[in-house]
A protein has these predicted regions:
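Residue-level signal for beta-strand positions within conserved beta-sheet cores that form or flank
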Residues: 2, 36, 155
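Short active-site neighborhood of thiol/selenol oxidoreductases, capturing the structured segment around
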Residues: 2-18, 40-41
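A short alpha-helix capping/helix-coil boundary motif
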Residues: 6-9, 91-94, 123-124
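Conserved strand-loop elements at the edges of beta-sheets that form or border functional pockets
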Residues: 8, 22, 168
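A short, structure-level motif marking secondary-structure boundaries and short turns
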Residues: 12-15, 97-99, 128-129
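Sec/Tat-exported extracytoplasmic proteins
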Residues: 13, 32, 36, 61-65, ...
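Structural alpha/beta surface segment adjacent to cysteine/selenocysteine redox centers
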Residues: 18-105
């Protein structure tokens, strides 16, 4: 059990979050987590339906899959994010009129997230089950409320170390705070 607990509030539609994973993911794992000094908890701070879709997919397969799923979604953010405008333009009001679960499934398929997550070994049926899971949706909604309303984070990524907010949102900021 690590003595230092880091909580990261993240959004999959946040380019700064993707940059943090790219810049700080490996050193955080190698220098702190692998040595048993730090544990990391990812908490979603969802901003919209696209973000909710990615958040639900990131948690598909349970706790053991969250980090790998999240890393893949951030690594491919430009790939699926680049399809959003054309997908939304093509779907228009039709998408807005769909029930929430159908929206989530349509977004996942239309942006290519379903195909991306297949790289992690998930079938479309498994991914759809994750997207429409009411307990998973509620869990992410609760994390989001805690992030924005209770903690009043300023943006994503945001970090806590043992419950105390870290000033700054970049890897050097977190690294310095961990060394302090």
């Amino acid at each position: 059990q690590a003595k230092v607990k880091v909580v990261e509030y993240l959004s999959f539609t946040c380019s700064h979050c993707a940059h943090f994973v790219e810049e700080g993911g490996k050193p955080l794992k190698a220098n702190y987590i692998a040595k048993g000094q730090v544990s990391l908890e990812l908490r979603n701070a969802v901003r919209d339906q696209l973000d909710m879709t990615a958040a639900l997919l990131s948690r598909c397969g349970g706790a053991a899959k969250v980090f790998g799923n999240s890393e893949l979604l951030f690594a491919t953010q430009a790939e699926w994010g680049g399809k959003v405008d054309s997908f939304v333009a093509a779907q228009g009001e039709k998408l807005k009129a769909m029930p929430m679960n159908a929206q989530l499934q349509a977004i996942a398929k239309g942006t290519g997230m379903t195909a991306i997550m297949a790289r992690r070994g998930f079938t479309p049926a498994q991914l759809n089950a994750c997207l429409i899971s009411r307990p998973a949706q509620q869990h992410i909604a609760d994390m989001t409320k805690e992030a924005w309303q209770t903690r009043k984070i300023r943006g994503t990524p945001s970090f806590l170390i043992n419950g105390t907010a870290v000033s700054g949102s970049h890897w050097p900021d977190l690294d310095s705070a961990l060394q302090a």
